[in-house]
Amino acid sequence: MYPRHDDVSLFQRFVNDHKLEEKGLPLYQLAQLEGTDQVMLGVDGTKIIDMITQAVREREKMAIYTYTTPYTVYEKINEFRTMFQSIKNCTPVFVFNGIQYSPDSAEEFGREKNVVPSEVAALTGTDSSRLSNTTNVRFAEIHKKTANRFVVEEDVEGQIIRIFRSEFKNTIRAPYLAWAQLSSFRHCNHRHISEVYGCLELLAFPGIDRVVTNINPTRGTFDVVYKARVLEAARLSEEDLSSLILVESRSRVMRTVTLKFSSLEDMIKKVVRYKGSTIGASFAQQLHEEAIRASEANRMRASNQRGAAFRNLSAFASPVLTLTPPHCLPLHFLYGIPGFPHADAESFVGLPLPPVLYYIMSAGLLSPSLFAAVSQETVVDDWPLVDSIKYRDVAETVLPLRVQTIYQLAWTMSRGLGSISWFRRYNVLPARVSKLHVPPAIQLDGWALHSVTVPRGLHLVDVMEFAHLACSVDQVIYNTMEETYAAILLQSLDLLGYLTHETQDLHEEGQSSEPSTFGRALQLCSVPTLSEYTVLLIELARTNAISTEPFRITTEEVSPRDTPRDIVFASRVLSIIPLNVSGPWTAPIDAELAAFSMLSRMISRSIRQLLEAITTLMFSKGRTHVPLHRIGEIQRLLPFSTPVEFGCGVLVEYMLMKDKCTLKDLEEAFPECTYLRHDLATLFYFWDLAVQVLQRIETKENFCVDQHCLSSANERMKRAQKNLNILTGVRETYY
C-alpha cells in the first residue's frame, strides 16, 4: 500500500484556469499515421492506472478490506475496452511503466497510514460486520481515509496489463517511463504512433505536440491540449515548459516537491534562472543551495526535496526501446537534446541492463521490480496494509528466496552483483535499510525431456511425473514450447526444494532425482488447476505464516476477538482460494484476513518472480530453440499470475461462526458470489487436500502448523459440509 499524493499540479491548474483544453472535437480529426489509414493511438498506461485507481476510490471506498483486485478494476477495464474498440480505424498502443525510480531510504511514511481504524478492527466476518452496515455518519471519515489508501500495486497492475494484452496485441511495458517511450514513438525516425492519449505530463516530452485528454465514444468526440497554445499562454520556451511540468508533477510515478508558489505564473516569476539553465533546473539548483544552507534539523527534508526535483528532471534521460541499434538508449540521446544538465539517470533508476532483458520485459507480463532489483541492487518490499510483527517475520523468512532469484538473474549478465540492500517498508526509519550478503551460488539442473512426450497446458503438479529426468544443465537444449515450459516449472520447483536428486549423465541409467517431502505433498493434488494454490499453501506453512495468533492491526485498544482458534486457522488456510463474484463487495469483512492476505501475496509474488527469472534465464542463456519473440506465449502460461484474494476466508469464517449455517444464509450474506455452490465444492475439496498436505509435510524438525488446531478445524469443516450438503468430487471441482 504505497503513499500517494493527490493534490493538483500547478500546471494542471494553469491549463484549467486558461481554458487550454479544447473540448468536443470530432473523432475523425484524430491524426492517422503517415502512409496509412489508421489512427495509431499511443495510450499512456499511467493515465489508465490513475483512472482505475480513482474509480475504485469512488465506487468501493473500503476496497482494501474486501478485494485484492476490486470488482471496479474489471468494470473500468471493460469501459476502456469499449471506448477504444468503438473508435473506427484506430489501433491503440498501450504503454505501461516499467522499472521505477530507485527507492529513497528517507521517504516519509506515518504510522497512522498502515494501521486499521479501531472501528474496522472490531469487524470479524459476522452478520454485524457487513460492509453495508458501515454507511452511517460514524464511518464517513473512515471511508474517505480508507479509499485514499487504495493504490494499484504491481501484482494487480500485472493483472490489468494481461487483460489489456489479451484484447489489444500492442500492449507493452516501457523499460522505465511510459511517457518517455511514447515520446520515442513520435520521433521522426521511429514514428509508430500518430496521437497520444494520457496525462498532461506528456506535453513535457519532445515529439508530442498535443495530448488527447478525454474520449467520448457516445458523442463521437475527444478533448485535447495543444503544446503550442500552452507555450503561448505561458510565454515560455519549450525547454522551460518541459522542465516546469516535470519538476512540479504530482503524478504517482514522480516524486512530490513541496512548492511555495501560488500558481505556475508565480513560480515562473520568482525562480531565479541559474547560469542559463531552464526554469525547472534552476529551481532544482535553488533547492540544492537551500539544502546546503539548511539547519541540522531541516537538512534532511531540504535534501529530500532537492533529490526529488533532480529525480523528476531525470525523466528526460529515461532509456527507451528502439527497433534499430543500440535498441535501448536514453531519450535525450535519441532527440539530441543539447546541454542537458541532469542526464545521468543511473543514480535514479539504476545501472543499465542488457537490451535483451528490456525486450523480454516489454511484453508486459513480467514484474518490473525483479529487473529493478538487478539494476538498482536493492530488494524492495511493498507497503503493508498493517506493519505487524508477523508481516516482518514472514518477510525475513521469504527474503533468501527473493535474493537467490535476483542473483540467478544477475549471474547471467557480464556484470555481477556485489552486496545488495534490503529496503523494508517499516514504520521505524532506522530499520528500513540493511545490507545483504551474497547468497551461495546454486547451479540449476536441466531436464532430459527429449525422450518423453510433453503435453501442452501443464500445471505444477503435472510436471512432477518428470522429476526423475534431471541432468546437467549443459547437456540439454529444449526444442519445443512444451519442453521449455515444463523445464521452467521443474527448475523452479527444484530451487524451492520440491525435488531431491543427484545429477547423472544422460547415458547413465537409473533414477537421478525424485520428489522431496514437499513434492510428494504437491502430488496429492488431483485437480491440476488447484496445484498452484497447493504450492502456495505449502509455502505459507514452511514460512510459518499460517498461525492462529491475532494481528496487532490498530494502535488503539479493542475488545479481544472471540473467534475460536480453529476457525481462524481454517479461514486463513482457505482465504487463498478465489471466489467467483459479480459485483462490488457488500458482504461481511474482516481486517485481520485482509492483513493475512499480505503474507499470501508476498509469498505468491516471490514464487512468481522465481518463475519469471527462470524463464528469462532460459531464453537469455540460449537453453531453448524456441524463438525469443514467442517468450510472451510462455509468460502467459506461468502460474501465480493472478493476485491472491482473501474473500473466501471471510466466507469460511462466516459459515463456521453461524450456527447451522445454510446455503440460503450464505447467499443472503454474500450476494456477490453468484456461483456459490460451485465455489463451496472447490473450497471443501481444497480443505480435504490441505489437511492431507499439512499432515504430510509435518516432521519432528518442522512443526508447520498446530496439529490439534488442524484436527479441530477439520471436524468443524466436516460438519459444515454435511449441513450444506456439498459434494466435492473432481467433477464438482474445477478451476
Swiss-Prot record:
<protein>
    <recommendedName>
        <fullName>Post-transcriptional regulator MKT1</fullName>
    </recommendedName>
</protein>
<dbReference type="GO" id="GO:0017108">
    <property type="term" value="F:5'-flap endonuclease activity"/>
</dbReference>
<feature type="region of interest" description="Interaction with PBP1">
    <location>
        <begin position="475"/>
        <end position="722"/>
    </location>
</feature>
<keyword id="KW-0963">Cytoplasm</keyword>
<dbReference type="InterPro" id="IPR022039">
    <property type="entry name" value="MKT1_C"/>
</dbReference>
<dbReference type="GO" id="GO:0010608">
    <property type="term" value="P:post-transcriptional regulation of gene expression"/>
</dbReference>
<dbReference type="GO" id="GO:0003729">
    <property type="term" value="F:mRNA binding"/>
</dbReference>
<dbReference type="GO" id="GO:0005829">
    <property type="term" value="C:cytosol"/>
</dbReference>
<comment type="function">
    <text>Involved in post-transcriptional regulation of gene expression. Promotes mRNA stabilization by recruiting a complex containing PBP1, LSM12 and XAC1 to mRNAs. Recruited to mRNAs by sequence-specific RNA binding proteins. May regulate translation through interactions with the EIF4E6-EIF4G5 translation initiation complex.</text>
</comment>
<dbReference type="GO" id="GO:0010494">
    <property type="term" value="C:cytoplasmic stress granule"/>
</dbReference>
<comment type="subunit">
    <text>Forms a complex composed of at least MKT1, PBP1, XAC1 and LSM12. Within the complex, interacts (via C-terminus) with PBP1; the interaction is direct. Interacts with RNA-binding protein ZC3H11 (via MKT1-binding motif); the interaction is direct. May interact with RNA-binding proteins CFB1 and CFB2. Interacts with the EIF4E6-EIF4G5 translation initiation complex via EIF4G5; the interaction with EIF4G5 is direct.</text>
</comment>
<dbReference type="Pfam" id="PF12247">
    <property type="entry name" value="MKT1_N"/>
</dbReference>
<keyword id="KW-0810">Translation regulation</keyword>
<dbReference type="InterPro" id="IPR029060">
    <property type="entry name" value="PIN-like_dom_sf"/>
</dbReference>
<dbReference type="InterPro" id="IPR022040">
    <property type="entry name" value="MKT1_N"/>
</dbReference>
<dbReference type="GO" id="GO:0006417">
    <property type="term" value="P:regulation of translation"/>
</dbReference>
<dbReference type="Pfam" id="PF12246">
    <property type="entry name" value="MKT1_C"/>
</dbReference>
<dbReference type="GO" id="GO:0005737">
    <property type="term" value="C:cytoplasm"/>
</dbReference>
<comment type="similarity">
    <text>Belongs to the XPG/RAD2 endonuclease family.</text>
</comment>
